């Protein structure tokens, strides 16, 4: 299954991924894109436990070391925080933080120059109001 078809409401995913796994799923989206690798929900769950065991994420899907997660799949990367108006270069990829109207906390989506590439909650089709922070 293409990763962009796997959403957080997929009941096969671990409950922690369903609730907090947006950044985790974005990293797998980029892995799928760069490595031409497809993931199914079972493989995402296995990766969740693997990366907890390696200390790259916490059980609530808080990402401790995204570079090591990508490195596991053979993607060499570095991470930095950029302000809202930053436009990535051709060899960069983005995970953008968004604030959903009337929802506590934040959500993360894969973007490229303000275009949404992958959103594990499918906010636009659900007509949810949100903004990139």
Predicted regions, residues:
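Noncatalytic regulatory segments and standalone regulatory/sensor domains
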Residues: 89-92, 112-133
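Residues in well-ordered beta-strands of folded domains
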Residues: 4, 97, 118
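Solvent-exposed loop/turn segments at secondary-structure junctions
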Residues: 29, 100-103, 123-124
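Short coil/turn linker and secondary-structure boundary residues
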Residues: 17, 39, 61-64, 118
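Helix-adjacent hinge/juxtasegments
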Residues: 49-80
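Active-site-adjacent substructure of cysteine-protease-like catalytic cores
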Residues: 76-115
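Hydrophobic, Leu/Ile/Phe/Ala-enriched alpha-helical segments that form helix-helix packing faces
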Residues: 30, 70-73, 109
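Active-site-adjacent structural segments surrounding the nucleophilic cysteine of cysteine proteases
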Residues: 1-57
